[in-house]
Design a protein with these regions (language model features):
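The feature marks cytosolic C-terminal regulatory regions of anion transporters and related permeases
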Residues: 1-144, 163-166
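Short acidic-hydrophobic, aromatic-tinged amphipathic segments that line or gate anion-handling sites
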Residues: 145-161
């Protein structure tokens, strides 16, 4: 009887751990974000993950805020989302302020996003980059894609650079 209780509880713990891990990976792979929309020097609104389907092209500048981490697991989701919905605008600000972690695969995805946007003649700014992220960016062989003018301290600076009166 003691052996059966021990085996059953171990199986239950393993099954629970596997289910929790699957839930975590599924949630993590979605790539958390929010989008701030601006038109004619004015803030329009902020869309969160659940509101993404309400997105329209009635704005001039889009601020795409990465949240959490940017890694291999969720990088493609961010890239696809930007390609599908954000790509229609001329000016895109990639806000990294709430990005807690970015690995080398996440950096590669970031460079792919920038390459794709610049190839389509979009004006791209990157804001909120930490010192650790800057070091990671400068050590990469694609660091030539990011110029000093593109990387600004905060989103307000980027909006001023574009011509917004803030």
């Amino acid at each position: 009887v003691v052996l059966m209780v021990g085996i059953d509880s171990v199986v239950g713990l393993l099954a629970g751990t596997v289910l929790a891990l699957l839930y975590f990976v599924e949630n993590f792979s979605k790539g958390h974000f929010d989008i701030t929309r601006n038109r004619g020097n004015q803030f329009i609104d902020r869309l969160y993950e659940g509101d993404f389907e309400k997105f329209s092209d009635s704005v001039d500048v889009v601020v795409y805020s990465f949240k959490g981490s940017l890694t291999y697991v969720n990088g493609e989701t961010h890239k696809d989302r930007i390609h599908e919905k954000i790509n229609m605008f001329n000016t895109i600000i990639l806000r990294m302020r709430e990005l807690g972690h970015m690995d080398h695969d996440g950096l590669e995805i970031l460079y792919e996003i920038i390459e794709e946007l610049e190839h389509e003649k979009k004006q791209v700014y990157i804001t909120g980059v930490t010192e650790d992220m800057k070091i990671l960016m400068l050590k990469n062989d694609k660091s030539h894609l990011i110029t000093e003018k593109m990387v600004l301290e905060n989103t307000t600076s980027a909006l001023r650079e574009i011509g917004f009166i803030i």
